[in-house]
Amino acid sequence: KEEISKILFSSNFKKGLQLLHQFSLCEIMGLSFSDYVYTNDLCGMWAQIKMNRNIPFTKIEKENIVKIQDILKRKQITRDILYEYGLYVSLIAGEILGIDVNNIHKMYQELPIYTRKDLRLSFKEICEILEVKPSRKVKNMEFFLIKEVINERVFNNKRLLKEYLLTNKSRWF
């Protein structure tokens, strides 16, 4: 892992990867890659490599690599992605995808909420408003409500959220 990481972080990383491929070392190590974009983040570099073997990453490195790969599969950075994955991972994936960093920062700053705790209604309040017991349906409803707020289809205001829930209750129950 350390030796490959040194190659990935080198200014001559493309040459290093070509040599690994040329001498069939990629096959031996269970690595493959095609198009490759340099990033200043090692997880971003590793996320672009397909790995057939278990490489000893830390838990955080593994999580970030998987998140970056998920975003790369989607081929875009949206408000939903920024909310779900956060700014850091989205910036790395955006760099690989060729998306302007300033656009990602601007989109992130314009998010009405950044975490579940920012929603003006708690899970308990949602249950009380709808007069239902906590359940998977209510959790899904909360998730849907968060998406509506993120995409500015409803404002993150307690009264408006309550109205929205009551108006759309029949969708879920």
Q: Where are each of the predicted segments found?
A:
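Amphipathic alpha-helical "coupling" segments that flank catalytic cores
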Residues: 6-9, 54
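Catalytic core of bacterial c-di-GMP phosphodiesterases, primarily the EAL and HD-GYP domains
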Residues: 13
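Divalent-cation-assisted or electrostatically stabilized phosphate/pyrophosphate-binding catalytic cores
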Residues: 2
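C-terminal subdomains that position terminal phosphate/3'-OH groups for nucleotidyl transfer/ligation
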Residues: 19-173
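Generic recognition of flexible, low-complexity loop/linker segments
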Residues: 5-6, 128
